């Protein structure tokens, strides 16, 4: 089927064709690092990790307070180091279990489960 004169086939006639492409930059919405309380008093609940160090415990002096007798007043510290959070036991009575393994400190990864006595939290990594 013959083409109209204004739509030449560049393969046959050696012509060129101009095209216009709109490029939209890809941007992501920042999401904060967070802990989700999935088991324990007040669950379900989300806590944003907005500072370089966040202390979690049952005391009103803790940055994140969870009212459970299984928690020490200052049970754990979450520290942001090199763009990721680490969890540290603050000499708590019941310790920390990370994905079922007792630890003293560790780097956290997306979806990690932290168990502090009967309290269970899930860690979610943020995007900047």
List the predicted regions and their residue ranges.
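Intrinsically disordered, low-complexity acidic Ser/Thr-rich regulatory segments
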Residues: 1-67, 79
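Forkhead-associated
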Residues: 43-120
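Short, Lys/Arg- and Gly-enriched loop/turn segments at beta-strand edges
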Residues: 121-128
């Amino acid at each position: 089927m013959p083409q109209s004169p204004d739509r030449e086939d560049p393969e046959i006639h050696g012509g060129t064709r101009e095209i216009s492409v709109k490029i939209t930059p890809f941007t992501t919405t920042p999401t904060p690092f967070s802990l989700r309380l999935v088991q324990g008093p007040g669950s379900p609940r989300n806590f944003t990790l907005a500072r370089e160090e966040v202390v979690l415990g049952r005391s009103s002096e803790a940055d994140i307070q969870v009212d459970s007798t299984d928690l020490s007043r200052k049970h754990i510290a979450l520290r942001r180091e090199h763009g990721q959070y680490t969890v540290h036991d603050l000499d708590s009575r019941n310790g920390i279990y990370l994905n079922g393994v007792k630890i003293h400190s560790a780097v956290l990864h997306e979806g990690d489960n932290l168990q502090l006595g009967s309290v269970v939290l899930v860690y979610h990594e943020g995007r900047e």
